[in-house]
Amino acid sequence: VVVTLASGLEMCDTTTDGGGWTIFQ
């Protein structure tokens, strides 16, 4: 699941990182 925020950042729901959210610029 990838969510694009209003600021243009992308949050990726990944199970490889403790099931947390990783933020990409």
Curated annotation (Swiss-Prot):
Where in the body, by tissue, does this protein show up? Hemolymph.
Q: What is its main location?
A: secreted
Keywords in alphabetical order? Lectin, Secreted
Q: Which SUPFAM superfamilies match?
A: Fibrinogen C-terminal domain-like (SSF56496)
What does the entry say induces or represses the expression of this protein? By infection.
Task: Look up the domain of life of the source.
Answer: Eukaryota
Gene Ontology MF annotations? carbohydrate binding
Its annotated compartments are: Secreted
One GO cellular component this record assigns the protein to is:
extracellular region
So what does this one do? Binds and precipitates antigens of the parasite Echinostoma paraensei.
Q: Know the name of this protein?
A: Hemolymph 65 kDa lectin BG01
To which species is this protein native?
Biomphalaria glabrata (Bloodfluke planorb)
